[in-house]
């Protein structure tokens, strides 16, 4: 491709409304342009990267035995009503009516459509297992789209769905998809990590997320220093303490704490160790008989709302009680609540169950208890894992300690079970002629999001440094003053043709531009290999080669450049 025949819409200035580096660089490099909040057009350079992501995903899905189909973006509301998600999904589901006043949605996901399709097309166990996938636009009406295509309202996604008669083939397909996802991100040249994940609103049992590692990532990943165990922070399990609870060494007493509304203030004012304090959080209960539930964690820990949400007595989704509700039930404000003498159900984190001589609110305003001990001052409450893990603590497999990293979720696989197939009566006849509800798996890749995530991981202060597998072009040719030098023009043209003939994607900058502008554009859009041609190089019988990622420069003989580039690409 010649730049003179190409739409290379680069910008010098960083857009003021772009928060993250990938959004800034995608705009500056002319990859995308904003049409409205969360809606973007893909320009040629961006689309070339997007298509490369698609191609790798498609190849690995095909290798995994999945069959490509295409389902509509617009979906009838009847299917969503059938599964109950018409009411549950929330305002992110864009609903509308056609001219006949029939309800439709813009699909944020396709579980309903695929289940409807398969229940009509598949009737016998002999047709299973079956894996189908598509690469299709999705729409979620995000309340505040952010970070460019990282969290847009309209986005491109690969979603695959598998159907099974038994758990054995479900497990086999899940493992095949797990392997395919590892292959996808490895081929793209990305640093990534698969982690155990919560199934969230989609439901199901087993689930893994795939995260591109980046300091700017919104998701916190906890992984073991001594094994392959890894999970997102919502799913990461805290090991149950192995130590015994120490015997009491002091009596429980009350202290006045008028200026201690938080754990930090309590610790500072009374010279307490934060690990000898607990905080008690009041949430809504699941039943009218038990409208409030107390959750108790150590003072230096954070409540894990996803874990707490799974307690049967806790209302789902988890909702904190208001100050008025807390005062009406307990007689004190949130900053003075503790587990002693509470007349509502109490759940404690496992780490709290081994504490002794600890401090907590006294359920009176401006008062706290110190020297609290289980089974002496209050009955030992039901213990559960309800906190976030912290760096350095033991992992549940006992093979290491937790370390933390930031990541951007780009893939998610689920074992859905019968959540959708049962609701939609998606059944087949087994070998005995008996009707059986199909098991389902769901496997998503954020195709457009990968582009942004790859840039978050691969950039410097001069621009984008995409891996070769994703770069819009592999080689850039920069001829210096080619419009004044016939030698430079001729050699540049020959190299351009030779690289094209070799099947190498090449961008020839044939503009009448200053060298500084040409260099800046090539670095901004992130071409992995750049070849500079000038009269001085020709006199010396060499091309100047520069590697975008390493910054390494080499002089390569004129007659060896194509072979050199071929060998560099193979490496």
Curated annotation (Swiss-Prot):
GO terms for biological process: prolyl-tRNA aminoacylation. This is Proline--tRNA ligase. Consists of three domains: the N-terminal catalytic domain, the editing domain and the C-terminal anticodon-binding domain. It is found in: Cytoplasm. Pfam families: HGTP_anticodon, tRNA-synt_2b, tRNA_edit. The keyword Lipid biosynthesis does not apply. GO terms for cellular component: cytosol. Homodimer. It catalyses: tRNA(Pro) + L-proline + ATP = L-prolyl-tRNA(Pro) + AMP + diphosphate. Catalyzes the attachment of proline to tRNA(Pro) in a two-step reaction: proline is first activated by ATP to form Pro-AMP and then transferred to the acceptor end of tRNA(Pro). As ProRS can inadvertently accommodate and process non-cognate amino acids such as alanine and cysteine, to avoid such errors it has two additional distinct editing activities against alanine. One activity is designated as 'pretransfer' editing and involves the tRNA(Pro)-independent hydrolysis of activated Ala-AMP. It comes from the Bacteria. It comes from Shewanella denitrificans (strain OS217 / ATCC BAA-1090 / DSM 15013). The keyword rRNA-binding does not apply. Its EC number is 6.1.1.15. Keywords: Aminoacyl-tRNA synthetase, ATP-binding, Cytoplasm, Ligase, Nucleotide-binding, Protein biosynthesis. One of its GO terms (molecular function) is ATP binding. CDD domains: ProRS-INS, ProRS_anticodon_short, ProRS_core_prok. Belongs to the class-II aminoacyl-tRNA synthetase family. ProS type 1 subfamily. InterPro entries: aa-tRNA-synt_IIb (IPR002314), aa-tRNA-synth_II (IPR006195), aa-tRNA-synth_II/BPL/LPL (IPR045864), Anticodon-bd (IPR004154), Anticodon-bd_dom_sf (IPR036621), Pro-tRNA-ligase_IIa (IPR002316), Pro-tRNA-synth_IIa_bac-type (IPR004500), Pro-tRNA-Synthase_IIa_type1 (IPR023717).
